[in-house]
């Protein structure tokens, strides 16, 4: 017997799960409970649900899609989302309790199947989408049946995202999109994309943007690979030529594109730089393994000291990310997520460089630079590839220079850069 809220009981019962209503699910009685009692009830509830999910859908005997679908239906996808939309309507901090039950048991991690969708687009659709959009998109996004991409950066507006020039023109009940996006991760696999275009060129640049969900298989959408120094092409450039988008696919209202994109970007920076791996995992694990592979006479004190400095930085970053994730899981991702993104990018580059250097001449050997189209953006395929791939960490998801501006202005309260185009209509701003 599993304890759930009264709202979710009916929907779970229809799917064959045994349910009961807890005293804590009754608003009046819940209001009388102490904070500690509510937390205890909620954590017990999600742990019980997670354990029941493992019993009904053993990861070793259940397909990834079926398991994640059942996880979504039980409200364990994003626990803070509403009932019926992958959540239980409780505090997002209890997602950690769910993950701590599921992942050690071998449950699939949705981030590996659909990193952009799960970490960035899903929260944006949940925040800004219509009821119909939430019901249509969130479940297959979580299961990975429909991969998503983020269509923000352009050749002339990467760091200056608000200056983008792709156009959206209204035509009856549709909008027609034209323009080019670049550095679009996994666009070649994506079924849908989160697209921001300029719909009012006479407004100031931040005010004239509108966001849409776009069908990546629609006529007029062309995806071209961008080959990276690893030999792969996980990034793409995407061209839109008279692509028709229903007005029903708008996120928010016309002109809300900047605010919609901030939701995405705040989640992106926590998603990229604010993950909470176990102590000693990630890039620092590669450095430790490279150290262990050395012969005793090569394990000198200077190299050990360098490794320990990297370890300490990795641990400081891990603890900082825990704090940033706590803020996000309370429903308020903020600019502090830029700390993890910036520090993590620099640390990855230095740590993988250290690991490669320890291998000596073998560190220069790389299997193949053959052009490939990866099935995920998160696969690890050796230290050499990780070293090459880490070069992009200080660029993707916002450059380190942009992160420093965000931290200086929004966290430290320092004066902002002089922006002469802040109050000028976009179509009046001089361009090269």
Q: What are these model-predicted stretches?
A:
Residues 166-169:
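A structural signal for short hydrophobic beta-strand segments in well-ordered beta-sheet cores
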Residues 2-117, 126, 132-136, 140-143, ...:
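Amphipathic, small/basic residue-rich leader segments at the start of a protein or domain
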Residues 144-152, 196:
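A short, Trp-centered hydrophobic/proline-enriched beta-strand micro-motif
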Residues 182-187, 229-230, 392-397:
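Glycine-rich phosphate/pyrophosphate-binding beta-alpha loops
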């Amino acid at each position: 017997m599993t304890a759930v809220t009264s709202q979710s009981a009916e929907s779970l019962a229809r799917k064959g799960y045994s349910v009961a209503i807890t005293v804590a699910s009754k608003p009046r009685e819940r209001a009388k409970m102490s904070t500690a009692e509510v937390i205890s009830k909620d954590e017990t509830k999600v742990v019980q649900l997670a354990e029941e999910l493992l019993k009904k859908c053993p990861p070793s005997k259940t397909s990834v899609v079926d398991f994640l679908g059942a996880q979504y239906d039980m409200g364990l996808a994003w626990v803070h989302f509403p009932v019926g939309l992958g959540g239980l309507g409780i505090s997002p901090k209890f997602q950690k309790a769910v993950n701590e039950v599921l992942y050690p048991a071998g449950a699939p991690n949705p981030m590996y199947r659909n990193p952009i969708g799960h970490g960035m687009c899903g929260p944006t659709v949940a925040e800004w989408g219509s009821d119909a959009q939430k019901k249509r998109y969130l479940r297959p996004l979580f299961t990975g049946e429909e991969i998503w991409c983020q269509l923000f950066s352009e050749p002339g507006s990467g760091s200056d995202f608000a200056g983008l020039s792709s156009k959206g023109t209204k035509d009856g009940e549709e909008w027609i999109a034209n323009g080019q996006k670049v550095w679009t991760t996994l666009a070649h696999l994506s079924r849908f994309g989160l697209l921001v275009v300029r719909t009012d060129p006479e407004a100031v640049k931040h005010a004239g943007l509108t966001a849409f969900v776009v069908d990546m298989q629609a006529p007029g959408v062309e995806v071209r690979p961008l080959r990276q120094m690893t030999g792969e092409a996980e990034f793409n450039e995407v061209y839109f030529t008279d692509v028709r988008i229903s007005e029903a696919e708008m996120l928010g209202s016309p002109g809300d594109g900047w605010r919609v994109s901030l939701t995405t970007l705040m989640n992106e920076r926590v998603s990229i730089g604010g993950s909470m791996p176990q102590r000693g995992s990630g890039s620092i694990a590669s450095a430790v393994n490279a150290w262990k592979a050395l012969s005793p006479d090569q394990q000198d004190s200077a190299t050990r000291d360098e490794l320990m400095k990297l370890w300490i930085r990795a641990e400081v970053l891990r603890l900082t990310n825990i704090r940033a994730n706590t803020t996000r899981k309370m429903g308020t991702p903020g600019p502090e997520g830029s700390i993890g993104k910036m520090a993590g990018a620099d640390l990855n580059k230095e740590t993988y460089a250290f690991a490669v250097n320890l291998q000596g001449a073998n560190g220069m050997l790389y299997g193949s630079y053959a052009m490939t189209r990866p099935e995920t953006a998160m696969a690890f395929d050796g230290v050499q590839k990780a070293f090459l791939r880490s070069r992009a960490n200080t660029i993707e998801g916002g450059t380190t220079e942009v992160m420093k501006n965000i931290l200086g202005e929004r966290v430290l309260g320092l004066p902002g850069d002089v922006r002469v185009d802040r109050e000028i209509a976009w179509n009046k701003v001089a361009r090269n």
